[in-house]
Swiss-Prot record:
The keyword NADP does not apply. The keyword Nucleus applies. Its main location: nucleus. This is RWD domain-containing protein 3. Residues 7-113 form the RWD domain. The gene is rwdd3. GO terms for biological process: positive regulation of hypoxia-inducible factor-1alpha signaling pathway; positive regulation of protein sumoylation. It holds the Pfam family RWD. The RWD domain is required for the sumoylation enhancement activity. It is found in: Nucleus; Cytoplasm.
Length: 257
């Protein structure tokens, strides 16, 4: 960790000093630092946000990766907040920026939420339907950019959250209603999503459903769908740990390696 990053973490831990406000989740010379900030945003009422920052060893020359979740916001709103923070981070000079991003979010939160709400009628998915978790394994992606674009489009339309992990293993982790997950799997099998070895468009014929189960009540619901380019199996395991699904990893993923 650079001295700049270390100094910034010290400042952040001093600012967010109440219990549960600041937590370092992971730290290594190779991967950098992953930490969580829990904050309350004043917007007529207090909105709790959990923001996870991943600062790489190249930080601040490389902006942090960011995840946002909140029980008071919809998946679309969390997605839009994350996108706005990432865009802002890209526009800033190469210097410590996390505290500045937190201040920017506080100042612009109301406008960002209004804009997001205009794009989507939902404010918070109020549903009594049971939330399910599904884990899919893909053999390959030849037309990766187009494939990912379709995956993101369908998860947004079907109000599914989760992760797409690309790398040695290609996994799609989904959370949502059972009906919407079934519809997603149907789309994946019936629409031409990739190309074959000759470059001709083709349907997904080598996808396997590793599991499709009700989400345990004690597990946190993911509020966004994010694409993660995972270079190592250790990184993949840590990603499952971060979202509280390490049991899922050990039960269904470790046997694939």
């Amino acid at each position: 960790m650079s001295k700049e990053a270390f100094d910034e973490l010290s400042v952040l831990s001093a600012i967010y000093c109440e219990q549960g406000e600041f937590e370092v989740l992971e730290e290594s010379p190779e991967k950098g630092v992953v930490f969580r900030v829990h904050t309350l945003i004043d917007n007529n009422e207090k909105t709790p946000l959990d923001i996870i920052f991943h600062i790489s060893p190249e930080y601040p020359n490389t902006p942090p990766d960011i995840s946002i979740s909140s029980n008071h916001l919809s998946r679309r709103q969390c997605h839009d907040l994350r996108r706005s923070l990432l865009d802002t981070a890209q526009s800033l000079p190469a210097e410590p920026m996390v505290h500045g991003l937190m201040l920017w979010l506080q100042e612009n939160f109301s406008d960002l939420i209004k804009t997001s709400s205009c794009h989507s009628a939902e404010v918070r998915p109020e549903t009594t339907e049971e939330t399910w978790t599904a884990l899919l394994h893909l053999d390959h992606m030849r037309s990766k950019a187009k494939y990912i674009k379709l995956i993101e489009k369908w998860t947004l339309e079907l109000r599914l959250t989760g992760r797409l992990f690309t790398g040695k293993l290609i996994l799609i982790l989904l959370q949502g209603t059972k009906e919407n997950i079934k519809q997603y799997i149907h789309l994946l099998k019936s629409v031409k999503v990739d190309v074959d070895s000759s470059g001709k468009r083709c349907k997904e014929k080598m996808m396997s459903v590793l599991c499709e189960i009700p989400k345990p009540e004690d597990k946190i619901m993911m509020t966004t769908f994010e694409v993660k380019d995972i270079l190592s199996l250790d990184d993949l395991r840590r990603e499952f740990d971060l979202i509280g699904l390490n049991e899922l990893y050990h039960q269904f993923v470790s046997s694939l390696t």
